Amino acid sequence: VGFKAGVKDYKLTYYTPEYETKDTDILAAFRVTPQPGVPAEEAGAAVAAESSTGTWTTVWTDGLTSLDRYKGRCYHIEPVAGEEDQFIAYVAYPLDLFEEGSVTNMFTSIVGNVFGFKALRALRLEDLRIPPSYIKTFQGPPHGIQVERDKLNKYGRPLLGCTIKPKLGLSAKNYGRAVYECLRGGLDFTKDDENVNSQPFMRWRDRFLFCAEAIYKAQAETGEIKGHYLNATAGTCEEMIKRAVFARELGVPIVMHDYLTGGFTANTSLAHYCRDNGLLLHIHRAMHAVIDRQKNHGMHFRVLAKALRLSGGDHIHAGTVVGKLEGEREITLGFVDLLRDDFVEKDRSRGIYFTQDWVSTPGVLPVASGGIHVWHMPALTEIFGDDSVLQFGGGTLGHPWGNAPGAVANRVALEACVRARNEGRDLAREGNEIIREASKWSLELAAACEVWKEIKFNWQAVDTI
């Protein structure tokens, strides 16, 4: 067929409702809001075209390749209930479009220029189905849930953490003191805040040294393995790895990375280093709400969570359902399952558009953090289960008697909830009573209960089905 210059509708090439998806295809579900007058089929086809092989006009070099082999295809369109001007477009991408083991390349195609396309008023990537054949090109999490439990020798309960506050301004020695007090009081982990890197008031090397001293002192006194998430995030990949190397030399168990601001290339490099050198990797999702908060534009966090499991991380922040940050229960539990489980069935009631098989990729521990305190402990234990990290920053350091009593209060509350659950009690219904009973024999918990008895964050979640 000879080359014919000009512009033709995307749907003539890229809308293929008869297409049967392959096991090796990457499947995407986009929420599309087209400009007025743009038909659904044309808008869906435009998304498929602009995120794969297409451009705005026909080009003669199309004849030098097999478009049928490489093009993305919009294979199904369905309306969004309650939204007249929105629909879900399902797009299938052949695996050959993507570099092996590169989240960066996958996202550059699927959520690249197409999000600025003029024919669309808004576009949101709701979910991805990543085929096993592509998953197997990634290392994934450095260690995973079971290996972490074995390293820490901690089983049968959620892990407890605390973000050191104030997040900025402390000297390294005072910072290390707070770490020691929290770990000595009964927490498993303490944490650098996401924006603690290497600032004039506290350079990274000083912080690492004082935190390592705190860890070893707390371990010696409690007989438990302890950790502090040392944030290795830096301005360059080379500097990031240098910090991780120093953490390994200190013998600490875990480092941390801000994976969205740091970038997927840097994160994958750090995850590989962590597996090779026995370090756990905690992931913070700073900047996620810029990408996932709007309901009709951007990318849902479940996609960012899947991308993290590919790129690599042993923990990731995943909302709390009950605290100060965004997170509706069923949707949150949907992507928590996508982080932890080996096989997750399609379930639209939880926002899961595709069945996902992780083919034994290690799981990631979800971290509940943000505005939570001892009264939330029963709900958090019931919602997240044992394979989670519950992190209380202000809920530890805000205790009226200090940091160590704050840690004691949280540990007592957690142990009480786990014991009550194991005895068959209903945490959702009897939670407050369980905490009150425990506070009778723990003065630290009683004081915490009194301070935070009136604190609630009663705003509606934006992210709903």
From Swiss-Prot:
Catalytic residues (UniProt): K165, H284
Localization per record: Plastid, Chloroplast
Annotated site location: Transition state stabilizer: K324
Chain positions with N6-carboxylysine modification: K191
Any one cellular-component term (Gene Ontology): chloroplast
NCBIfam families cross-referenced by the UniProt entry: PRK04208.1
Misc note: The basic functional RuBisCO is composed of a large chain homodimer in a 'head-to-tail' conformation. In form I RuBisCO this homodimer is arranged in a barrel-like tetramer with the small subunits forming a tetrameric 'cap' on each end of the 'barrel'.
Record-given protein name: Ribulose bisphosphate carboxylase large chain
